[in-house]
């Protein structure tokens, strides 16, 4: 009951953003730097998709202009209100032709999906990426060891994503396709950690 109330509150874009600032201070700067570094190693992409975009794309901070896709109509409406195209849809059945995008991104989505759906979503992202393009996935992972990062462990346990994984478990979701390169790093003052992974098609 309490969880449902919290989830409904997080449907409001300003509460969604505020919760991120409170629970993950410093995350925006660190993650932006990491992704910026990664972009220097990747080919230029013109047609970009952000899967699980939320009410606004993280990629906007990097002056990228993706099409957004999210299961929440509230989020895609807000995304569209900012002047960018967005589609309401499911990550495990992306409504695009094979090879349609130069790059496909997913930031903070997979821990909201059970293993079978997450695997299918990754498969779909690769399917709609053109040969020579790339897929980038960033997702949270459980702290290891938990006792060294108690604040991060607690935040992860309270996360509305019900499928928070260890690094090994997240990498196993990706392992159906060979060639993923992943980097684990801490990205907030509360000790939150994530895995930034790229796949060149």
Report the location of each language-model feature.
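Class I SAM-dependent methyltransferase Rossmann-like catalytic core
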Residues: 2-33
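Class I SAM-dependent methyltransferase SAM/SAH-binding core
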Residues: 49, 54-93
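A conserved beta-strand element that flanks and buttresses the S-adenosyl-L-methionine
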Residues: 105
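A short glycine-rich, Lys/Arg-flanked "PGG" loop and its adjoining helix->strand segment in the class I
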Residues: 119-131
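Conserved beta-strand signature within the Rossmann-like core of class I S-adenosyl-L-methionine
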Residues: 132-140
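Short, glycine-/aromatic-enriched active-site segment of Class I SAM-dependent methyltransferases
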Residues: 144-160
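Short alpha-helix
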Residues: 162-178
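Conserved S-adenosyl-L-methionine
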Residues: 179-190
